[in-house]
Design a protein with these regions (language model features):
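Outer-membrane beta-barrel porins/channels
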Residues: 1, 5, 10-193
Length: 193
């Protein structure tokens, strides 16, 4: 599967995936997602109309997944993903993991599912713009000291989800399904759909 979408003439979203069904061994998958932003002119407090220099930004996620039916009613899946964010000369990267389970009951094909997404270490931006020359006291002429700036680490948007679904009715050419899920993100409000 491959898709490419352009949003608002500035953002480009690309996604590609491949799944291999290994029969009783489960299913293996590879995925690639990318968000790119067109170059934009850099502005500053003193040059609000632009400096003449430009920057771009890009997010990338490359994942490997495995899923398997452990019994005729219980399924599990796991994804390991490398994530990288790039803004101008700085970038941050790290590993994230997703895990999910699904259990199906015989009553109206009731399915109970749970997942945890983006479990991983904090990320931190680093790059060439972090190296600066520092003057300890602007009132006295000093030799500029090479200095390295450091950004704060930030957490990945960890997400827990729980859901249930079941058949309302089944007919030869139609099926009614009702579903409910609850989502608990670490960086936003909980919600129920």
């Amino acid at each position: 599967h491959f898709s490419l979408t352009r949003w608002f003439d500035t953002f480009e979203v690309s996604a590609a995936s491949y799944v291999y069904n290994a029969g009783s061994f489960g299913a293996f998958a590879a995925s690639l997602m990318m968000l790119g932003v067109d170059e934009m002119e850099i502005t500053t407090e003193f040059q609000p109309n632009g400096t003449g220099a430009y920057f771009d930004a890009q997010d990338l996620a490359v994942g490997l997944s495995y899923g398997r039916e452990l019994t005729d009613r219980f399924r599990v899946g796991l994804t390991a993903r490398y994530i990288q964010q790039h803004i101008w000369n700085e970038s941050a990267g790290g590993l994230a993991f997703d895990v999910g389970t699904q259990y199906q009951l015989p009553f109206r094909n009731l399915v109970i599912a749970m997942s945890m997404s983006n479990f991983g270490a904090d990320m931190r931006y680093n790059g060439s713009d972090m190296s600066v020359k520092w003057d300890g006291d602007a009132n006295f002429p000093n030799r500029l000291v090479p200095t390295r700036l450091e950004t704060e680490a930030f957490a990945l948007p960890l997400n827990f989800a729980f859901g249930i679904a079941m058949d309302l009715f089944r007919a030869p050419y139609a099926r009614g399904l009702v579903a409910l899920d609850a989502v608990h993100p670490n960086d936003n409000k909980e919600c129920i759909h």
